[in-house]
């Protein structure tokens, strides 16, 4: 058997410590064809073809 990192008595320690934050109301996301359209626009249409390092979809850099 492999070793366990730490005892199971400490399981869930961090999640238990973090303060509860209420979920916020958000706009509904488009479904089906409309969502595919959104994805296509995000990935291919508005993407600027430039030189340098490729940035991921979650990048906040401009």
From Swiss-Prot:
One family name in Pfam for this protein: Ribosomal_S30
Keyword Ribosomal protein: yes
BP-aspect Gene Ontology terms: translation
InterPro entries: Ribosomal_eS30 (IPR006846)
UniProt keyword Coiled coil present: no
Any one of the GO CC terms: mitochondrion
Region (Disordered): 1-38
Residue ranges, compositional bias (Basic residues): 25-38
Keywords, sorted A to Z: Ribonucleoprotein, Ribosomal protein
An annotated Gene Ontology molecular function: mRNA binding
Similarity comment: Belongs to the eukaryotic ribosomal protein eS30 family.
Name by which UniProt lists this protein: Small ribosomal subunit protein eS30z/eS30y/eS30x
Gene (UniProt): RPS30A
């Amino acid at each position: 058997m492999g070793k366990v990192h730490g005892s199971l008595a400490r399981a869930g320690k961090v999640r238990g410590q973090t303060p509860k934050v209420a979920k916020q109301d958000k706009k509904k996301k488009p479904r089906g064809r409309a969502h595919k359209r959104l994805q296509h626009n995000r990935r291919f249409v508005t993407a600027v073809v430039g030189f340098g390092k490729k940035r991921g979809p979650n990048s906040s850099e401009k």
